[in-house]
Amino acid sequence: MRARLAVSTAGIQVELREILLRDKPDAFLHASPKGTVPVVELADGTVLEESRDVMQWALSQNDPDGWLDVQHQDPDHTAAFLDALDGPFKTHLDRYKYASRFDPDTALEHRAAGAAMLAEFETRLAARPSLSGEKNGLLDFAALPFV
């Protein structure tokens, strides 16, 4: 979702293909043996396999709404936020949301840990209009599918 948002905002034309993850097409697996979505195959053969990378690529081409402003202003904070979102937060979210695939006995612990991270988001939002600062940007749209 966040990769598509960035590609759309950047105004980049791409061919979207819906992938049924239980029946992955050979061409998809050839481009990305990892077999996860999203995948963007660039004209030069470069393959982007992470939504965060797709967002960065698209917005580096065209950033009409200034989503990357926060990254230009504070690259260390931006990287740390995205690392926490894509790492610990996503881990806690998955282990709570899909507890039956993991350890159901720890689901509530993961919910509490994820809630603590959301409380940090709330603290930031109490001080300014968006996670990215004065206007919605990269951090807000990167977090959107998870909250």
Language-model-detected regions and their locations in the chain:
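GST-like domain detector, emphasizing the conserved glutathione-binding G-site
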Residues: 1-115, 122, 126-129
